[in-house]
UniProtKB/Swiss-Prot annotation:
Catalytically driven reaction(s): N(4)-{beta-D-GlcNAc-(1->2)-[beta-D-GlcNAc-(1->4)]-alpha-D-Man-(1->3)-[beta-D-GlcNAc-(1->2)-alpha-D-Man-(1->6)]-beta-D-Man-(1->4)-beta-D-GlcNAc-(1->4)-beta-D-GlcNAc}-L-asparaginyl-[protein] + UDP-N-acetyl-alpha-D-glucosamine = N(4)-{beta-D-GlcNAc-(1->2)-[beta-D-GlcNAc-(1->4)]-alpha-D-Man-(1->3)-[beta-D-GlcNAc-(1->2)-[beta-D-GlcNAc-(1->6)]-alpha-D-Man-(1->6)]-beta-D-Man-(1->4)-beta-D-GlcNAc-(1->4)-beta-D-GlcNAc}-L-asparaginyl-[protein] + UDP + H(+)
Main enzyme class: transferase
Coiled-coil stretches noted in the UniProt entry, renumbered to this chain: none
Protein name per its UniProtKB record: Alpha-1,6-mannosylglycoprotein 6-beta-N-acetylglucosaminyltransferase A
EC numbers for this chain: 2.4.1.155
Keyword line: Disulfide bond, Glycoprotein, Glycosyltransferase, Golgi apparatus, Membrane, Secreted, Signal-anchor, Transferase, Transmembrane, Transmembrane helix
Location of region: Sufficient for catalytic activity: 212-740
Keyword Disulfide bond attributed: yes
Positions glycosylated per UniProt: N109, N114, N117, N333, N432, N446
């Protein structure tokens, strides 16, 4: 508060000066009136002199504080408060002088009837104001008209909370909250961004400053290499980025030619890789060069590269010490209000392990950074598991859920959970320019390559592989000494470099799935090299209800095959989804593949350029820190009614569309549903993942009572779910056709 001391002292000194001046002036007036009765000075003239002095003071004060957001709710000791104080002081002085003049006039003339310029009229001027001086002294605030709250679904609830809790932390009063609805509204619109800004309010200078720095695309990796060199944990990712550097540079240049990448705000972004911290107990970085899982490292390296090339300021953390150093300004801040001033970060990319570390490190300040989080989450987190109390009521004991974030803040490896956002990765092309020329000359052999580098994946698959072996050679890339489950006719190449694997795939006609691992990147790499993928069908579908692998994961998603993305979004002739236990079905697929000629195919979303486009759109358009959700645009909305027993994900998919959860809020009022020919004879609010829904017999609508429970997953047994679907760009399913 030291910053405001000069204003406070200045106003006190001026007040003292005015009181003294008024007293001396009054005495002089008395003396002058008695001595010079023939030329009485007008009280209005004297009043004008005092007002002129006050105007000069106010003008100087305004100049000193021109960068302060001023107004009736701007906080304590602002120019507005000083003006009100001065107004009260002047009014008091003028009233006293008016009484003094009246007494003098009575004393000299014996009556006040002939006084035409008496200041007794001054109080009537005050009465013309919206609020009287006495009201201001008693703390009454000016009324303000609240704007419409459409598009700000949380605003009303936040105002109700503030009415009960605004005294729980003195920081609210520091921001000008005084118990009135208008002060709540201004705080929630300008400090925490849950409500629309009042049109007459000036913009916060910090917000204005935020838009001064623009992002410029980068076309070299020097700064990023230097940044990542400090961490041995980043070695595998660093090597991947170096291998793909030329492709990335070409991609960012190509994207800049296709769409306008200028006038984008350069954002401060924290990237915290919890899985790579020593405290996590995982050894992903250590096993990366010896056959360990690479999916997370692939996704992280591609994300970091994209953020960097798009021109944002990134800071990378892979230890608790680094995290604390970056966030030290707010660590320990127990205030219920956000930290004032320049922001440390504006976006935070993190994983589930890092999420727990981040919350523990920040303590109470955590709540102010929740909306900035983007959580890398390969298998996804459905709303049912994300909502803490709802998950508890359903008996879910997963250690990965209950974060109470907007479900779209979870970023997945594939677009399998529409409630989440699809981040994806890049399918690497390991070849240099001379390789590319040579690879096109490679002739396809009558051979297949099995997708499974661990011996245990091959268990109980011999009959299935025998069918394939009847028609072609079977090759493998299994590592390790154990090969007991591998048939003797298989030609095992062991672990291959990325380059050698590409050449092997170019010689191969069929890439053979064994049913595990689920949803890996390898099938996409095979398809990109011209192989057909034999995709094992799961009947019944696999989920946490019947498969140990999914137990504990925060999703009830059902996998209909080893690779649902390839099944749904690619399909034939590149992907053949078959029942491994149906000999005829397998044989028919193998014969068809041998008789067809297919070209290499790579979905745009798994290229460098596709990922850059998608991440840029998310950074520019996705905003969970402000109440109004305007993206994707409403022009993309297509409303569908699901049949009982059918989820929104299913009904949208049947119509070649995607379920878009951000549109649910536009289908949660009776008047909104009328626009889409859904007429509610009656309605009620209910907190459940299966609503909004419609019961056609009675035309009864059930609307959502908790915004975090909007869900594309889940089927109602008797009601029709009211589903928000949207179109998508072929090869870029995360974006609608009007999204760019």
């Amino acid at each position: 508060m030291a910053f405001f001391t000069p204003w406070k002292l200045s106003s006190q000194k001026l007040g003292f000066f005015l009181v003294t001046f008024g007293f001396i002036w009054g005495m002089m007036l008395l003396h002058f009136t008695i001595q010079q009765r023939t030329q009485p000075e007008s009280s209005s003239m004297l009043r004008e002199q005092i007002l002129d002095l006050s105007k000069r003071y106010i003008k100087a004060l305004a100049e000193e504080n021109r960068n302060v957001v001023d107004g009736p709710y701007a906080g304590v000791m602002t120019a507005y408060d000083l003006k009100k104080t001065l107004a009260v002081l002047l009014d008091n002085i003028l009233q006293r002088i008016g009484k003094l003049e009246s007494k003098v006039d009575n004393l000299v003339n014996g009556t006040g009837a002939n006084s035409t310029n008496s200041t007794t009229a001054v109080p009537s001027l005050v009465s013309l104001e919206k609020i009287s001086v006495a009201d201001i002294i008693n703390g009454v605030q000016e009324k303000c008209v609240l704007p419409p709250m459409d598009g700000y679904p949380h605003c009303e609830g936040k105002i109700k909370w503030m009415k009960d809790m605004w005294r729980s932390d003195p920081c609210y009063a520091d921001y000008g909250v005084d118990g009135t609805s208008c002060s709540f509204f201004i705080y929630l619109s300008e400090v925490e961004n849950w409500c629309p800004r009042l049109p007459w309010r000036a913009k916060n200078p910090y917000e204005e400053a935020d838009h001064n720095s623009l992002a410029e695309i980068r076309t070299d990796f020097n700064i990023l290499y230097s940044m990542m060199k400090k961490h041995e944990e980043f070695r595998w990712m660093r090597l991947r980025i170096r291998r793909m550097a030329d492709a990335w540079i070409q991609a960012i240049k190509s994207l800049a030619e296709k769409q306008n990448l200028e006038k984008r705000k350069r954002k401060k972004i924290l990237v915290h890789l919890g899985l790579l911290t020593k405290e996590s107990g995982f050894k992903i970085a250590e096993t990366a060069f010896s056959g360990g899982p690479l999916g997370e490292l692939v996704q992280w390296s591609d994300l970091i590269t994209s953020l960097y090339l798009l021109g944002h300021d990134i800071r990378i953390s892979a230890s608790l010490a680094e995290l604390k150093e970056i966030m030290k300004k707010v660590v320990g801040n127990r205030s219920g209000c956000p930290t004032v001033g320049d922001r440390i970060v504006e976006l935070i990319y993190i994983d589930i392990v890092g999420l727990a570390q981040f919350k523990k490190t920040l303590g109470p300040s955590w709540v102010h950074y929740q909306c900035m989080l983007r959580v890398l989450d390969s298998f996804g987190t459905e709303p049912e598991f994300n909502h803490a109390s709802y998950a508890q009521s359903k008996g879910h004991k997963t250690p990965w859920g209950k974060w109470n974030l907007n479900p779209q803040q979870f970023y997945t490896m594939f677009p399998h959970t529409p409630d989440n956002s699809f981040l994806g990765f890049v399918v690497e092309q390991h070849l240099n320019s001379s390789d590319i020329h040579h690879i096109n000359e490679i002739k396809r052999q009558n051979q297949s390559l099995v997708y499974g580098k661990v011996d245990s994946f091959w268990k109980n698959k011999k009959i299935y592989l025998d069918i394939i072996h009847t028609y072609m050679e079977v090759h493998a890339t299994v590592y390790g000494s154990s090969t007991k489950n591998i048939p003797s006719y298989v030609k095992n190449h062991g672990i291959l470099s990325g380059r050698d694997l590409q050449f092997l795939l170019r010689e191969t006609k069929l890439f053979v799935g064994l049913g595990f691992p689920y949803e890996g990147p390898a099938p996409l790499e095979a398809i990109a090299n011209g192989c057909a993928f034999l995709n094992p069908k799961f009947s019944p579908p696999k989920s946490s209800k019947n498969t140990d692998f999914f137990i504990g994961k925060p999703t009830l998603r059902e996998l209909t095959s080893q690779h649902p993305y390839a099944e749904v979004f690619i399909g034939r002739p590149h992907v053949w989804t078959v029942d491994l236990n149906n000999r005829e079905e397998v044989e028919d697929a193998v014969k068809a593949i041998l008789n067809q000629k297919i070209e290499p195919y790579m979905p745009y979303e798994f290229t460098c350029e596709g990922m850059l486009q998608r991440i840029n759109a998310f950074i520019e358009k996705q905003d969970f820190c402000h109440g109004q959700v305007m993206w994707p645009p409403l022009s993309a909305l297509q409303v569908k009614l699901a049949e009982p027993g059918q989820s929104c994900k299913q009904v949208c998919q049947e119509n070649q569309l995607i379920c878009e959860p951000s549109f649910f809020q536009h289908l949660n009022k009776e008047k909104d549903l009328l626009k889409y020919r859904v007429t509610c004879q009656s309605s009620e609010l209910y907190k459940d993942i299966l609503v909004p829904s419609f019961y056609p017999k009675s035309k009864h609508c059930v609307l959502q009572g908790d915004l975090l429970l909007f869900s594309c997953a889940g089927a109602h047994p008797t009601h029709q779910r009211i589903c928000p679907c949207r179109d998508f760009i072929k090869g870029q399913v995360a974006l609608c056709k009007d999204c760019l």
